[in-house]
From Swiss-Prot:
UniProt site (Mammalian adaptation): K627
GO biological process: 7-methylguanosine mRNA capping; cap snatching; DNA-templated transcription; symbiont-mediated suppression of host cytoplasmic pattern recognition receptor signaling pathway via inhibition of MAVS activity; symbiont-mediated suppression of host gene expression; symbiont-mediated suppression of host mRNA transcription via inhibition of RNA polymerase II activity; viral RNA genome replication
Oligomer and partners: Influenza RNA polymerase is composed of three subunits: PB1, PB2 and PA. Interacts (via N-terminus) with PB1 (via C-terminus). Interacts with nucleoprotein NP (via N-terminus). Interacts (via N-terminus) with host MAVS (via N-terminus); this interaction inhibits host innate immune response.
Main location: virion
Gene expressing this chain: PB2
Residue window of motif Nuclear localization signal: 736-739
Protein name per the record: Polymerase basic protein 2
Protein's job: Plays an essential role in transcription initiation and cap-stealing mechanism, in which cellular capped pre-mRNAs are used to generate primers for viral transcription. Recognizes and binds the 7-methylguanosine-containing cap of the target pre-RNA which is subsequently cleaved after 10-13 nucleotides by the viral protein PA. Plays a role in the initiation of the viral genome replication and modulates the activity of the ribonucleoprotein (RNP) complex.
Organism, scientific name: Influenza A virus (strain A/USSR/90/1977 H1N1)
GO cellular component, one term: host cell nucleus
One example GO MF annotation: RNA-directed RNA polymerase activity
Keywords, sorted A to Z: Cap snatching, Eukaryotic host gene expression shutoff by virus, Eukaryotic host transcription shutoff by virus, Host gene expression shutoff by virus, Host mitochondrion, Host nucleus, Host-virus interaction, Inhibition of host innate immune response by virus, Inhibition of host MAVS by virus, Inhibition of host RLR pathway by virus, Inhibition of host RNA polymerase II by virus, mRNA capping, mRNA processing, Viral immunoevasion, Viral transcription, Virion
Family assignment from sequence similarity: Belongs to the influenza viruses PB2 family.
């Protein structure tokens, strides 16, 4: 009332009325800002003056039954007045304190499970180590980074279905959980969250954090894996950086890292096989990373790296529309060009056919350690602005841009012949020939490029052919900048096509990627990569090829044996024997193969010489194209452990050792498996081979006359039965087979049946 009187008093003075009515309100915008709309314009001020009131909080009426009207100190906790405009009660902040101290306690068992990502973050920070702070200029570039450590890689839709199924299992709505990961996660979470009292909405939010990759486009200098991004605000400022080592790793970073390594290995291997595309697909489908199928990871994981993108393209997935050259990702930001074939002469007068891009174009170039902006016209570099972590990185970027520009002075700077080949010994295309040449040595290129005087532009500096910086002169069109160039932020994915040589093109036919662009960097994967394809056996060197080849034969012995007998050529051509050939000295491969094939043919022809162990041991040698020669060998050489080691044609050696008693095969001391059937090389071996073509029916049956010797057996007619004397004077009943096709199985079953018949 006092205030109203005061205002009336003020209004009665003419001066007040005049000020309020005559003064122009020229800041209408400000008045509007603070008076229109439901959005609070100054939340902190609002909070402050609300909290200065006695009852700033509203609560459900039921609270009055759960909280006393006054606390121990006699302070009122809630007002008897209703909140205007709703049927809630006005509550004092002291009520919150009372509730926290005296309110009901629920079980906390679910908290670490629901807030798993937070608990894990605390652990990582607790065990992380922060090093010294350095003050220096930070070259940050915006990159798309993963801001959410410890997540699975489900798509938003897949995650939504999982969350609905876990949090609101009885809600209506079609939910189809199809992928392996969806089903596993749903089962796991349902078990974890039984009797959970935390609000379903909160649970849903937290599950989303755990299931979906969240990315942001952030300025980063340094590590980009999610465990570094979560502390970005602590590790880099505008002019300082703090060293930090994370206190733990998270699966999503490990998956990204291992995926890149697997993809690189697979692309490199596929590139040298007879049908690269088919091989690549076969390997992607048969590889597991950390126990998950690689193809499933490729479908969900947004990692953009050359090899990964080639694998995705092969699977028909969309990839980024940027293209790769010299390890840099190029994104055209303006302009356009048409392609035309042109013949050019190198400094060595070698003719190159290059596809010239005619027209003005601008690109951003982003590499691991350097970035640049490139403006070019037809076969002319107009401007290149580079920034990089160190001199070496800047040189790499300049070389790539100069080659990409296709300028004549670059082509004329070639000294010597260009004859670089890829892993499959095929010549590289001309642009990659030039690139390799100058990556080896760029001296002549920089010397021939030409220099120009430069203007003083803030943040830019000149660079001379010897890589020293200057404020007066610079290589023509080239400047070094303190600022990085941001990665292209648009995450659009386009439909691409891939040819059998793994060249990936967009729909206009521009080559985006090729195996030449796949990095040669070797790393050690964080998660176990299991390559089931025989093409990847050589990844761990010659020993692994040897062991894997013999393991494969033993695992598939049943089918191998039948093919050995009935269709040897098909067996020799199996791709599983391909890697083995690289271990056999080139000069002698053909002779070995001819020798072994002849030996095998004799085994098939001459009864009594079928010898399982020997077949297994020599089989891989028969896979090479055979040379006919009369040469006999008592041992065959394989190149392992840096030298030639011998495999004895008859008997054991350190390379191939079969233990008759344990039936175990060791190759170079490594276990290569157990033979399930018994290749006993004594009498049984001979007998089983001799009894090929005969079915052993059981013990001696006197009705079929006296026991014949093994040699007399050949006189039996098909279907005729007879007793036969074998080995140690035992007699068994046999019948000559009516069909020849089943002959092979006899030699396996004979041994077992003889034993049964005798015992």
């Amino acid at each position: 009332m006092e205030r109203i009187k005061e205002l009336r008093n003020l209004m009665s003075q003419s001066r007040t009325r005049e000020i309020l009515t005559k003064t122009t309100v020229d800041h209408m915008a400000i008045i509007k800002k603070y008076t229109s709309g439901r959005q609070e314009k100054n939340p902190s001020l609002r909070m402050k003056w609300m909290m200065a009131m006695k009852y700033p909080i509203t609560a459900d009426k039921r609270i009055t039954e759960m909280i006393p009207e006054r606390n121990e100190q006699g302070q009122t906790l809630w007002s008897k007045m209703n909140d205007a405009g709703s049927d809630r009660v006005m509550v004092s902040p002291l009520a919150v304190t009372w509730w926290n101290r005296n309110g009901p306690v629920t079980s906390t068992v679910h908290y670490p499970k629901i807030y798993k990502t937070y608990f894990e973050k605390v652990e990582r920070l607790k065990h992380g180590t922060f090093g010294p702070v350095h003050f220096r200029n930070q070259v940050k570039i915006r990159r798309r980074v993963d801001i959410n450590p410890g997540h699975a890689d489900l798509s938003a839709k897949e995650a939504q279905d999982v969350i609905m199924e876990v949090v609101f299992p009885n809600e209506v709505g079609a939910r189809i959980l199809t992928s392996e990961s969806q089903l596993t996660i749903t089962k796991e979470k349902k078990e974890e969250l039984q009797n959970c009292k935390i609000s379903p909405l909160m649970v849903a939010y937290m599950l989303e954090r755990e299931l979906v990759r969240k990315t942001r486009f952030l300025p980063v200098a340094g590590g980009t894996s999610s465990v570094y991004i979560e502390v970005l605000h602590l590790t880099q400022g505008t002019c300082w950086e703090q060293m930090y080592t994370p206190g733990g790793e998270v699966r999503n970073d490990d998956v990204d890292q291992s995926l890149i390594i697997a993809a690189r290995n697979i692309v490199r291997r596929a590139a040298v096989s007879a049908d690269p595309l088919a091989s690549l697909l076969e390997m992607c489908h048969s590889t597991q990373i950390g126990g998950t199928r690689m193809v499933d990871i490729l479908r969900q994981n947004p990692t953009e790296e050359q090899a990964v993108d080639i694998c995705k393209a092969a699977m028909g997935l969309r990839i980024s529309s940027s293209f790769s050259f010299g390890g840099f990702t190029f994104k055209r930001t303006s302009g356009s060009s048409v392609k035309r074939e042109e013949e050019v002469l190198t400094g060595n007068l070698q003719t190159l056919k290059i596809k010239v891009h005619e027209g003005y174009e601008e690109f951003t170039m982003v590499g691991k350690r350097a970035t640049a902006i490139l403006r070019k016209a037809t076969r002319r570099l107009i401007q290149l602005i580079v920034s990089g972590r160190d001199e070496q990185s800047i040189v790499e970027a300049i070389v790539v841009a100069m080659v990409f520009s296709q300028e004549d002075c670059m082509i004329k700077a070639v000294r010597g012949d260009l004859n670089f080949v890829n892993r499959a010994n095929q010549r590289l295309n001309p642009m990659h020939q030039l690139l390799r040449h100058f990556q080896k040595d760029a001296k002549v290129l920089f010397q021939n490029w030409g220099i120009e005087p430069i203007d003083n532009v803030m943040g830019m500096i000149g660079i001379l052919p010897d890589m020293t910086s200057s404020t007066e002169m610079s290589m023509r069109g080239v400047r070094v900048s303190k600022m990085g160039v941001d990665e292209y932020s648009n995450a659009e994915r386009v439909v691409v096509s891939i040819d059998r040589f793994l060249r990936v093109r967009d729909q206009r036919g521009n080559v985006l990627l090729s195996p030449e662009e796949v990095s040669e960097t070797q790393g050690t994967e964080k998660l176990t990569i299991t390559y089931s394809s025989s093409m990847m056996w050589e990844i761990n060197g010659p020993e692994s090829v040897l062991v894997n080849t013999y393991q494969w034969i033993i695992r598939n012995w049943e089918t191998v044996k039948i093919q050995w007998s009935q269709n040897p050529t098909m067996l020799y051509n199996k791709m599983e024997f391909e890697p083995f050939q690289s271990l056999v000295p080139k000069a002698i491969r053909g002779q070995y193969s001819g020798f072994v094939r002849t030996l095998f043919q004799q085994m098939r022809d001459v009864l009594g010489t079928f010898d399982t162990t020997q077949i297994i041991k020599l089989l891989p040698f028969a896979a090479a194209p055979p040379k006919q020669s009369r040469m006999q060998f008592s041992s065959l050489t394989v190149n392992v452990r840096g030298s030639g080691m011998r495999i004895l044609v008859r008997g054991n050696s350190p390379v191939f050792n079969y233990n008759k008693t344990t039936k175990r095969l060791t190759v170079l001391g490594k276990d290569a498996g157990t033979l399930t059937e018994d290749p006993d090389e004594g009498t049984a071996g001979v007998e089983s081979a001799v009894l090929r073509g005969f079915l052993i029916l059981g013990k001696e049956d006197r009705r079929y006359g006296p026991a014949l010797s093994i040699n007399e057996l050949s006189n039996l007619a098909k279907g005729e039965k007879a007793n036969v004397l074998i080995g140690q004077g035992d007699v068994v009943l046999v019948m000559k087979r009516k069909r020849d096709s089943s002959i092979l199985t006899d030699s396996q079953t004979a041994t077992k049946r003889i034993r049964m018949a005798i015992n």
